[in-house]
């Protein structure tokens, strides 16, 4: 409605009052005299109706309809950098828009609208009625509705009584009284259509729970009205619901609230200075005061760093009683026990304590509240003894001499980390501690004893020690206060599983990852095993087991989950594991002599056979430390099997590696990567495969490798082989990590098997990595038979996957068995196949087999994939490195060079399979049809 002049606004209302009063007076003065003597109840009845009409009309005209005062200048300044012009509020599951009022300078509540005539925002705005010269809103709608109902009854009564009066005195129709009665009947007839129509319209609106504004604008047309309570309840609530106080005069309510105003809403300003101002500062401990008056919001968290200014809530209110009409949003109170978090941002309270996702219009001024910070916790009320917040004292300079609660990095005592048994791969709730992700495997409760400590192992061990001390201090404080607190999920904990980059996540040194690039691949840092490191590591793992509960791994191991529990239980599990290893060692040593005899017999048979006839029987797939996720097949096979080789995936995978497909290719790889052989002699004979597997079980032996990479021990070279990056042990060892107590058992085996290495020279096969982006060199110990160094098994006479911890069965094909070729047991995923290796057949007899040719188009239209480009780049780079380590001499096919490369202790064990070609690896690279199973 257009804005009217002040003088013209009163004309309709004045006319309405004149008509109402005049008609009522004329009715009582003329027609009603006829009913006084004969029907006196008519006068009383009509008097009551008239009273309700005038009373409701007066209230509807002069009552505050629910005006929301305009924002004060202080509040207006606060909203200079406000959010967009719309905000959403959810009411009964329906999202309702809240518009920004440019005139009143605030977001209008639901069902609120700005009246252009009154120039005010009206709560539950219905319409502006010119006949009452007032808006009809939340506070006066019931009186307006009662006015319409009573006026309708009043009009009907006047019309009916005047009609009866005229019919009674028809002979005297020319008198004054009958003429007045006829005029009143005519006036009622003229006003009947609008009055009765308006009354009926509002009856419908009341029954539906709508307003005139909502009905006219069609907000809930054909949809659900979240404000409706049902027909009967709508009528009762409209007429008999609560009467809300007026907001135009808040001073009249100030005296009523004076008794409760002493309860302050405190603002906590944490700084990193680490100054403790004594018991007066509380456990928050920095004594920084921040007072935000009048909604202006002076945030002084960083500017007043290290000060000890304190304002009592009572004195603050006493000094600002004259400003009671101005909204004060944040105040400073004594310390409430809320401790400093590990984040560098400053925490402020919002309008309501404990709120997290508040609207932007209710936020403090800019730069006062970070969206990643945790909001103010529930605060301690004045003179309250039932609020259990432990006062944590200074713990000797921990975390910058700022008192911390449970958990390393400064967890709050109000948010104690709960140690729950975790059987799910999903992330557990954590606080804002820096080490909340990518914890080293050495500190994992699921990690078996004997794994090498990662790069950040020492740092994380220190953090674990600090975390244990802080947790003990927090538990002691909890016991003193005899209270029990539970951790509540915060906004940061909800954002973290979603992958939102927060300053704390990006600033954490543990979370940083530098994946390799095609031009600059990064080598993983491996640390070899020795006796001291293993012993020290086992002791540290047992001590830090209780504090390492926050470690989380996406790749679950096959062992039973070892969650934080009593150290005695973990020691029993470790002792049981060592006993099983010793039993297996004794059993394998007894079978060693028989195995060596069988190996010598089969070596002679393999020397006479072609290299492509060497059979590879795929054993239990063990995975790779360079993959972080289980495939579908691995999930199915995880709990299957028994015995030595049955426990598939019974190891803890290294999770913080940087050269994995997920980080480089950008997609989680969940398939099983396998090779295929298209060489001549590849058959699908099921009986032959069973024969090979039975033969493999007779000649099986296992290799023990470090957690650095995938190793393979084959043939007579299955002994301990020291390497620059690897330490391999074979010859009947259990496929677990070799500890220092068992190195002496392999000293004799090493000497015997080194002699066998010199006697039997193996073929040099091109290595193939399970992860094309990994630059890890796959050393191969030469044997009589050919071996494929794959991450799911080994080949030749003897093979093992060292880091996987699974026993790789190897079959040596004998011409007497009546078949050639090999048949790897494909167990899921996309089958991807390497070329058949070429090798030395005995003393100097180098038989070169051409790589199998995969049929391709003459002019391939598809460009080289990213994975293949990385594979080619890595192969060429590793070839140059191998040539440099061998003194610049490429693989010449001589037995001496092969023996030197196979038995050497320092260089990479990688032999060229194409001695007649200048580019030995390039030929096989183009034959690799490497694909990724997604």
From Swiss-Prot:
InterPro entries: Palmitoyltrfase_DHHC (IPR001594). It comes from the Eukaryota. Disruption phenotype: Lethal at larval stage. RNAi-mediated knockdown results in extra vein material. RNAi-mediated knockdown in the wing results in tissue overgrowth due to enhanced cell proliferation. Residues 336-440, 506-525, 669-705, 751-780, 835-862, 881-934 are annotated as: Disordered. Residues 397-411 have a biased composition (Gly residues). One of its GO terms (cellular component) is plasma membrane. It catalyses: L-cysteinyl-[protein] + hexadecanoyl-CoA = S-hexadecanoyl-L-cysteinyl-[protein] + CoA. Residues 1-9, 69-142, 199-934 are cytoplasmic. Its main location: Golgi. It is a multi-pass membrane protein. Its EC number is 2.3.1.225. It is found in: Golgi apparatus membrane; Cell membrane. Residues 99-149 form the DHHC domain. The active site is at residue 129. Residues 688-705, 751-765 have a biased composition (Low complexity). Residues 31-47, 164-177 are extracellular. Keywords: Acyltransferase, Cell membrane, Golgi apparatus, Lipoprotein, Membrane, Palmitate, Transferase, Transmembrane, Transmembrane helix. Palmitoyltransferase that catalyzes the addition of palmitate onto various protein substrates and therefore functions in several unrelated biological processes. Regulates tissue growth possibly by regulating Ras64B protein stability. May regulate CG34450 mRNA levels. PANTHER family: ANKYRIN REPEAT AND LEM DOMAIN-CONTAINING PROTEIN 2, PALMITOYLTRANSFERASE ZDHHC8. The DHHC domain is required for palmitoyltransferase activity. This is Palmitoyltransferase ZDHHC8. It comes from Drosophila melanogaster (Fruit fly). The lineage of its organism: Eukaryota, Metazoa, Ecdysozoa, Arthropoda, Hexapoda.
């Amino acid at each position: 409605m257009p804005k009217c002049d002040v003088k013209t606004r009163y004309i309709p209302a004045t006319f309405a009052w004149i008509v109402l009063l005049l008609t009522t007076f004329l009715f009582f003065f003329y027609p009603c005299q006829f009913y006084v003597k004969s029907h006196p109840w008519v006068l009383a009845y009509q008097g009551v109706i008239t009273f309700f009409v005038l009373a409701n009309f007066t209230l509807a005209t002069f009552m505050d309809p629910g005006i929301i005062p305009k924002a004060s200048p202080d509040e207006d300044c606060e909203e200079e950098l406000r959010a967009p012009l719309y905000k959403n509020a959810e009411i009964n599951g329906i999202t309702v828009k809240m518009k920004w009022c440019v005139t009143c300078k605030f977001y209008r509540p639901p069902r609120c609208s700005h009246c252009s005539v009154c120039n005010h925002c009206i709560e539950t705005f219905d319409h502006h009625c010119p006949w009452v010269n007032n808006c009809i809103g939340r506070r006066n709608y019931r009186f307006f509705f009662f006015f319409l109902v009573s006026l309708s009854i009043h009009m009907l009564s006047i019309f009916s009584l005047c009609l009866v009066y005229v019919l009674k005195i028809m002979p005297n129709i020319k008198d004054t009284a009958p003429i007045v009665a006829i005029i009143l009947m005519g006036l009622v007839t003229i006003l009947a259509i609008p009055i009765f129509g308006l009354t009926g319209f509002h009856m419908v609106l009341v029954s539906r729970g709508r307003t005139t504004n909502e009905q006219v604008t069609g907000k809930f047309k054909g949809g659900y009205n979240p404000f409706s309570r049902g027909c009967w309840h709508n009528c009762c609530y409209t007429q008999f619901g609560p009467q809300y106080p007026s907001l135009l005069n808040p001073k009249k309510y100030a005296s009523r609230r004076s008794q409760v105003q002493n309860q302050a809403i405190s603002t906590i300003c944490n700084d990193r200075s680490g100054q403790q101002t004594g018991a007066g500062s509380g456990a928050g401990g920095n004594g920084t005061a921040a007072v935000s008056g009048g909604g202006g919001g002076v945030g002084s968290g960083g500017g007043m760093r290290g000060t000890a200014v304190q304002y009592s809530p009572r004195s603050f209110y006493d000094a600002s009683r004259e400003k009671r009409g101005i909204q004060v949003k944040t105040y400073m109170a004594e310390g409430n026990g809320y401790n400093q978090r590990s984040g560098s941002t400053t925490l402020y309270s919002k309008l309501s304590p404990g709120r997290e996702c508040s609207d932007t219009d209710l936020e403090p001024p800019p730069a006062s509240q970070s969206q990643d910070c945790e909001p103010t916790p529930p605060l301690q009320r004045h003179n309250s003894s039932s609020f259990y917040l432990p006062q944590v004292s200074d713990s000797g300079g921990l975390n910058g001499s700022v008192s911390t609660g449970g958990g390393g990095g400064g967890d709050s005592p109000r948010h104690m980390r709960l140690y729950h048994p975790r059987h799910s791969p999903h992330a557990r709730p954590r606080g804002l501690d820096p080490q909340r992700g990518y914890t080293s495997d050495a500190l994992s409760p699921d990690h078996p004893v004997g794994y090498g400590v990662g790069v950040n192992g020492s740092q994380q061990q220190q953090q674990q020690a600090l975390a244990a001390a802080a947790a003990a201090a927090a538990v002691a404080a909890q016991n003193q206060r005899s209270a029990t607190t539970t951790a509540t999920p915060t906004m940061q904990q909800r954002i973290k599983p979603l992958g939102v980059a927060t300053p704390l996540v990006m600033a954490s040194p543990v979370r940083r990852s530098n994946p390799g690039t095609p031009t600059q691949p990064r080598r993983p840092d491996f640390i070899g095993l020795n006796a001291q490191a293993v012993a020290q590591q086992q002791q540290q793992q047992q001590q830090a087991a209780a504090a390492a509960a926050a470690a989380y791994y996406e790749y679950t191991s096959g062992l039973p989950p070892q969650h934080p529990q009593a150290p005695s239980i973990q020691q029993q599990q470790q002792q049981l594991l060592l006993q099983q290893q010793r039993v297996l060692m004794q059993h394998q040593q007894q079978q060693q002599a028989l195995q060596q005899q069988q190996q010598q017999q089969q070596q002679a048979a393999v020397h006479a056979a072609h290299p492509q006839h060497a059979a590879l029987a795929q054993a239990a797939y063990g995975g790779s430390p360079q993959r972080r996720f289980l495939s579908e097949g691995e999930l199915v096979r995880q709990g299957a099997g028994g015995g030595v080789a049955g426990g598939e995936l019974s190891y803890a995978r290294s999770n913080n590696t940087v050269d994995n497909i997920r980080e480089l290719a950008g997609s989680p790889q969940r398939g099983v990567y396998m090779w295929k052989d298209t060489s001549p002699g590849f058959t699908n004979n099921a009986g032959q495969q069973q024969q090979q597997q039975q033969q493999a079980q007779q000649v099986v032996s296992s290799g023990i490798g470090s957690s650095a990479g995938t190793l393979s021990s084959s043939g007579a070279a299955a002994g301990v082989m020291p390497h620059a990056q690897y330490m391999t042990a074979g010859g009947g060892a259990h496929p677990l990590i070799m500890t220092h107590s068992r190195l002496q058992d392999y000293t004799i085996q090493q000497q015997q098997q080194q002699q066998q290495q010199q006697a039997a020279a193996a073929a040099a096969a091109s290595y193939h990595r399970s992860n094309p982006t990994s630059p890890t060199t796959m050393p191969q110990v030469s044997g009589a038979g050919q071996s494929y160094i794959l991450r799911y098994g080994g080949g030749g006479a003897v093979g093992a996957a060292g880091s996987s911890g699974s026993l790789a069965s190897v079959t040596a094909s004998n011409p007497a068995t009546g078949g050639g070729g090999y048949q790897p047991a494909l167990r899921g995923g996309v089958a991807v196949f390497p070329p058949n290796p070429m090798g030395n057949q005995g003393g100097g007899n180098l038989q070169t087999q051409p790589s199998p040719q995969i049929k391709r188009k003459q002019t391939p239209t598809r460009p080289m994939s990213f994975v293949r480009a990385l594979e080619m780049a890595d192969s060429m780079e590793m070839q140059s490195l191998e040539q440099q380590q061998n003194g610049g001499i490429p693989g010449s096919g001589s037995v001496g060079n092969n023996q030197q490369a196979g038995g050497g202790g320092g260089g990479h064990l990688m032999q060229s399979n194409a001695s007649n070609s200048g580019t030995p690896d390039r030929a096989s690279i183009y034959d690799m049809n490497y694909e990724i199973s997604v």
